[in-house]
């Protein structure tokens, strides 16, 4: 009906042990091959681990050497600085106790050279100019002293010489005009003290010197221009804030007075600021005003010699 085939498991085992020597040798060869593979694996792992340990050790030595170098250089720097400080302290101590020897004098020249050099020195001394006491940068100090009445007289003489067409003008006439205005303001209570002082007369002279023309044809015209300059002097260097116009007016038209004021301001504004800020400029104007009297004396002397 049907056939069946059955294979027993012991049949393969039987074949393995059919030849005893052959089977044992084969088994031994298989085991040896397995052991050789294991030994190779172990040997490779040991070989790979040894260089890694060496690399780690070498890197650690390098790090230690790098860390040690800054410390050694720092110690060297400290030692060098200590040595330098010690040398400086020793040098300072030596300088404090050091006595400088006197400089050696040059040898004396022969007699003939000495006489020639002495004559040359004497000639050079004669030719050399004497140095000035003051330095070149600083101007010389000038002292000028004068009273109020003296300066007013000098101002009157200046106006008489400037206005040569006014034959009957006296040096005292301008002085009377100025004192009349000053007295009027005192009596009216516009000022507590007189305005006519040496400094204010110098300021007025500075204005009159550039404003009053030599072509003035009448005493009235001269008085109008002079009182205009006096009003500006009051306004600029006076003690009060404002002053009335009536004492300064010699004419009924105020527009003419203000026109003269504006022309004087446009002409003399810079000098009015300069005389207040520069003391040397004020001293020069003071000296010029005082010298006006000397010019009058010279003129009188020349007129006497002509006669």
Curated annotation (Swiss-Prot):
PTM characteristics: The p35 form is proteolytically cleaved by calpain, giving rise to the p25 form. P35 has a 5 to 10 fold shorter half-life compared to p25. The conversion results in deregulation of the CDK5 kinase: p25/CDK5 kinase displays an increased and altered tau phosphorylation in comparison to the p35/CDK5 kinase in vivo.
Pfam families linked to this entry: CDK5_activator (PF03261)
GO annotation (BP), single: regulation of dendritic spine morphogenesis
TM stretches of this protein: none
GO cellular component terms, A-Z: growth cone; nucleus; perikaryon; perinuclear region of cytoplasm; plasma membrane; postsynaptic density; protein kinase 5 complex
Biased composition regions of type Pro residues, renumbered to the chain: 100-110
Tissue occurrence: Brain and neuron specific.
Disordered: region residues: 96-136
Feature: compositional bias, Polar residues: 112-125
PANTHER family cross-referenced by the UniProt entry: CYCLIN DEPENDANT KINASE-5 ACTIVATOR, CYCLIN-DEPENDENT KINASE 5 ACTIVATOR 1
Listed name of the protein: Cyclin-dependent kinase 5 activator 1
Organism: Spermophilus citellus (European ground squirrel)
């Amino acid at each position: 009906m049907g056939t069946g085939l059955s294979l027993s498991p012991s049949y393969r085992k039987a074949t393995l042990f059919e030849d005893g020597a052959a089977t044992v040798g084969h088994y031994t060869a298989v085991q040896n091959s397995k052991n050789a593979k294991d030994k190779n694996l172990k040997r490779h792992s040991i070989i790979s681990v040894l260089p890694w340990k060496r690399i780690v050790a070498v890197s650690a030595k390098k790090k230690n050497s790098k860390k040690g170098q800054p410390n050694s250089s720092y110690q060297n720097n400290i030692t060098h600085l200590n040595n330098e400080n010690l040398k400086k302290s020793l040098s300072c101590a030596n300088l404090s106790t050091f006595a400088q020897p006197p400089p050696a004098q040059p040898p004396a020249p022969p007699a003939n050279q000495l006489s020639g050099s002495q004559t040359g020195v004497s000639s050079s001394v004669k030719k050399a100019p004497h140095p000035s006491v003051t330095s070149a940068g600083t101007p010389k100090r000038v002292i000028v002293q004068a009273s109020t009445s003296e300066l007013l007289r000098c101002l009157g003489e200046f106006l008489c010489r400037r206005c040569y067409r006014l034959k009957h003008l006296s040096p005292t006439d301008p002085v009377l005009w100025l004192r009349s205005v000053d007295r009027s303001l005192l009596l009216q209570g516009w000022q507590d003290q007189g305005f006519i002082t040496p400094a204010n007369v110098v300021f007025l002279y500075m204005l009159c010197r550039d404003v009053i023309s030599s072509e003035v044809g009448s005493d009235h015209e001269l008085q109008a221009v002079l009182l205009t300059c006096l009003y500006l002097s009051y306004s600029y260097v006076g003690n009060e804030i404002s002053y009335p116009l009536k004492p300064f007016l010699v004419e009924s038209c105020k527009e003419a007075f203000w026109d003269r004021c504006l022309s004087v301001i446009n002409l003399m504004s810079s000098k009015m600021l300069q005389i207040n800020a520069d003391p040397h400029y004020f001293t020069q104007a003071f000296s010029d005003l005082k010298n006006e009297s000397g010019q009058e004396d010279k003129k009188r002397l020349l007129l006497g010699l002509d006669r």
